[in-house]
Regions:
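Positively charged n-region of N-terminal signal peptides that target proteins for export
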Residues: 1-4
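A solvent-exposed, acidic/Ser-Thr-rich amphipathic alpha-helical stretch
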Residues: 25, 44-96
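Short, low-complexity N-terminal intrinsically disordered segments enriched in polar/charged residues
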Residues: 15-49, 53, 145-150
Length: 150
């Protein structure tokens, strides 16, 4: 009897994994839309459909809470870098979290920026609830001329 139970459990594992896969795929799609529609295209309406009202955005030392302040942050970013563009290099999903590795490119005045980083998203009820950013701020500062380069 034990052997039959174990065999049945092992046989059902692929079904359980397959049932969980769509959640990860949907969450990855939300993260992709964040980069494409919000960051790359600057779509204000995409913010409403993808971001939770009580979103928390962390890019140390900056912490932004709430969708209104998040909108202001994005507007300032797009003003500083009008041609801002993110290219996704990798993405991983586990449960309600999505990790992305990206390259951010843009121009501020005459200075070009090409910086790599990673984001971790917490997605609940189909909306981004939290974003953690980790990026190469030294490279960004060097490229923008605020810190001497190597």
């Amino acid at each position: 009897m034990k052997r039959a139970t174990v065999s049945l459990a092992v046989a059902l594992l692929p079904l359980v994994a397959a049932a969980q896969a769509p959640v990860r795929v949907d969450n990855k799609a939300i993260a992709r839309r964040y980069f494409d529609e919000i960051l790359n295209k600057g779509s204000a309406s995409a913010i409403d459909s993808l971001v939770a009202p009580d979103v928390v955005f962390r890019n140390p030392p900056v912490v932004v809470k709430g969708i209104d302040d998040f909108r202001k942050l994005l507007a300032a970013l797009r003003t500083a870098f009008p041609d801002l563009h993110f290219t996704l290099e990798d993405e991983l999903a586990e449960g309600n979290k999505v990790a992305t590795r990206w390259v951010m490119r843009g121009t501020q005045g005459t200075r070009k920026m090409d910086v790599s980083g990673m984001d971790m998203f917490l997605i609940e009820d189909g909306k981004i609830r939290e974003i953690w950013v980790n990026m190469d701020t030294l490279a960004q500062a060097q490229q923008m001329g605020t810190v001497a380069g190597p």
